[in-house]
């Protein structure tokens, strides 16, 4: 596990965000779930590689436990041997225990089948979490939750 991948914890958090907002700081490889009163729950995450990072605001528009995964076209181009669908719960499924899809594209906040990738710049733009952490976050959020991705 990269050194930057620390355990989830409650931390001080400054910023003009409403309680319940998710803030991803890619340079920190951290996801913050804003609790309010200057506090947030910080989770270590894996984020997009340098050429795959994005910033902006999205909303959670889908939530699934043990999701099946259909590799996006870009991933299939890079890894043509991948099947068209990997069933949920399969050890080869990179979505892990849960996924929260984001509006505006093919990105999601999801678990992983590669826990050693947490804390790195590793994905095609998705936000990867330890499976225990994604399940914890999943239990705290719902459809329409605001997600802000910054550097």
Language model features with spans:
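Exported/periplasmic cell-wall-interacting domains
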Residues: 9, 13, 17, 37, ...
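Residue-level signal for tight coil/turn positions that link beta-strands
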Residues: 26-28, 104
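Sec/Tat signal peptide C-region and signal peptidase I cleavage site
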Residues: 2-7
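Structural recognition of beta-strand segments within beta-rich domains
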Residues: 23-25, 32-33, 128
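Short, surface-exposed beta-edge/turn micro-motifs
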Residues: 18-21, 28-30, 96-97
């Amino acid at each position: 596990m990269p050194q930057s991948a620390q355990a989830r914890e409650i931390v001080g958090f400054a910023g003009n965000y409403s309680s319940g907002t998710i803030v991803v700081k890619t340079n920190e490889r951290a996801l913050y779930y804003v609790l309010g009163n200057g506090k947030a729950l910080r989770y270590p995450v894996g984020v997009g590689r340098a050429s795959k990072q994005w910033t902006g605001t999205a909303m959670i528009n889908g939530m699934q436990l043990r999701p099946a995964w259909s590799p996006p076209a870009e991933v299939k181009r890079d890894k043509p041997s991948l099947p068209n669908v990997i069933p949920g719960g399969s050890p080869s499924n990179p979505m892990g225990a849960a996924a929260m899809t984001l509006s505006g594209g093919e990105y999601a906040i999801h678990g992983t089948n590669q826990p050693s990738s947490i804390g790195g710049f590793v994905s095609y733009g998705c936000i990867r979490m330890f499976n225990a952490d994604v399940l914890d976050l999943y239990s705290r959020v719902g459809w329409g939750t605001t997600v802000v991705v910054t550097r």
